[in-house]
Amino acid sequence: MRFIPLQTEQQVSCWAAQHIINRINDFKPTAERPFVLGLPTGGTPLKTYQELIRLYQAGKVSFKHVVTFNMDEYVALPEEHPESYHSFMYNNFFNHIDILPENINILNGNTDDHNAECHRYEEKIKSYGKIHLFMGGVGVDGHIAFNEPASSLSSRTRIKTLTQDTLIANSRFFNNDVTQVPKYALTIGVGTLLDAEEVMILATGHQKALAVQAAVEGSINHLWTVSALQMHRHFLLVCDEAAQQELKVKTVKYFTELEGAVAGTDYQGK
């Protein structure tokens, strides 16, 4: 695990965006050999997308040879709905960069056969070999994508029933009306995420502190989905100060000193 303890949400966003750009540029993608990037939605990555757009406009990166796979999508919510994850991604990121439309992959929550759609998505990922970097956020209960507590830690892309906590948390995007939040979603599985070459999770705010504690100091536990990433060879957790508040002082000190020791190296994980 590599843990990046920062101070502010803006620092988290800028650090994450620069890491993505470094990975893309170091990879030197081409049409025949694209860089494959996994992406989330929600409030946490929004500023990272804004920073990526700024750096793209400054000529620091091109997304022309980047293929993206999103984590999840609501079931039975029209793609044109302002709160669909299709709308979120296009409005907040894709419409502002040079990514090719055919390189964008988002689960179709309006298909008649959800199982077939999930299988198709898994096969599409496999067709590229692997996802090189998967960025994600984490829920207050430790869920990743829509892999709610007690999800199988070897799960693949599938349909999931959303918990009441998730419905309440997401109601802020639906005029605080929990009855308007879709009850089901298609989501990549924990196993799908673990297959990625590198996973970078962003956590900001005190409400994420218990999830961060579970990810860093806790045992691997299906009730805290994020804890499964302890098994990943290249798991990167980037947090602001508020999200670190449940960690032991010596834990933060250890990782802070470790980052200082490896600054400027090609260190990828421990």
From Swiss-Prot:
It comes from the Bacteria. The keyword Hydrolase applies. GO terms for molecular function: glucosamine-6-phosphate deaminase activity; identical protein binding. Its EC number is 3.5.99.6. It catalyses: alpha-D-glucosamine 6-phosphate + H2O = beta-D-fructose 6-phosphate + NH4(+). InterPro entries: Glc/Gal-6P_isomerase, Glucosamine6P_isomerase, Glucosamine6P_isomerase_CS, NagB/RpiA_transferase-like. The active site is at D72 (proton acceptor), D141 (for ring-opening step), H143 (proton acceptor), E148 (for ring-opening step). The record marks S151, R158, K160, T161, Y254 as: Part of the allosteric site. One of its GO terms (cellular component) is cytoplasm. One of its GO terms (biological process) is N-acetylneuraminate catabolic process. Keywords: Allosteric enzyme, Carbohydrate metabolism, Hydrolase. Allosterically activated by N-acetylglucosamine 6-phosphate (GlcNAc6P). Pathway: Amino-sugar metabolism; N-acetylneuraminate degradation; D-fructose 6-phosphate from N-acetylneuraminate: step 5/5. It holds the Pfam family Glucosamine_iso. Belongs to the glucosamine/galactosamine-6-phosphate isomerase family. NagB subfamily. Homohexamer. NCBIfam families: nagB (TIGR00502). Catalyzes the reversible isomerization-deamination of glucosamine 6-phosphate (GlcN6P) to form fructose 6-phosphate (Fru6P) and ammonium ion. This is Glucosamine-6-phosphate deaminase. It comes from Haemophilus influenzae (strain PittEE). The gene is nagB.
